[in-house]
Amino acid sequence: MPDRFANGDPSNDQIPMRTSYKVDRNSPNARHGGDLAGIEQHLDYIEDLGVTAIWLNPVLENDMEGGSYHGYATTDYYRVDPRFGTNEDYVRLIEKTHERGMRVVMDMIFNHCGSDHPWMKDIPSHDWFNNLDNYVQTNHDKEAYFDPYVSDYDKETMLNGWFVPSMPDLNQKNPHVAKYLIQNSIWWIEYCGVDGIRQDTYPYADVDMMRNWCTEVMNEYPEYNIVGEAWMNYTIGSAYWQKGSRLNFGQDT
């Protein structure tokens, strides 16, 4: 988690953002000042641990009123959060990591964005989000996909409900949303040479779109590394999402 690791550039601790925030290491919900420079300055330490790949929690802009340190409520899909550094800083970190024979995994979130994303103030289309008119909370029933007895209501609530009130649920069935997200992944791979993608909240998103996303990325980069977060309570639940699984009826994600 970059914000919690090391503060290599104090000049970006308190910079102007759209929303207010504070740096307070005594508060678990505030930002603590860690950044990309701090990671770069400690690559010796990371390498000495025997690390071969670094998975960073999301580094893209998370301009939210509270709890922005974790990065899981994106407000700009093409900009590194300036409190972590710049896009160029991210590229340099990856290059420096590669020089040591290590790799970098980028954390992406396509199920939802942050409620302070400009889309929420100027929505591209009404179906850009799910349940925009009436808030629906997801039931987090991640087994709904493969439960033969699940109700349509429970399955729809799982897929289309908002993760939390500050994380609007993106409608990946909208072809423009799907294209935006797919192109965003390819852009980042091309731009910074990141070695792999960790896709957050994988079972919460539309399975057809995510399958297409995987296909498009792998068509461009056949040897690429992708892992989806499928935080299940049972082994069979995790097995459903594995590549080549016989449990998911050909929906090879």
Place the predicted regions along the sequence by residue:
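A cross-domain feature marking catalytic cores of carbohydrate-active enzymes
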Residues: 2-4, 58, 106-112, 201, ...
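Alpha-helical packing segments of well-folded alpha/beta enzyme cores
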Residues: 35, 39-42, 89, 93, ...
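Residue-level preference for long, well-ordered alpha-helices that form the structural scaffold
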Residues: 28, 35, 82, 86, ...
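Conserved, mostly hydrophobic/aromatic
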Residues: 46, 56, 77, 97, ...
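N-terminal structural segment of carbohydrate-active enzymes
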Residues: 1-103, 118
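Active-site-adjacent "subsite" loops/lids of carbohydrate-active enzymes
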Residues: 120-192, 202
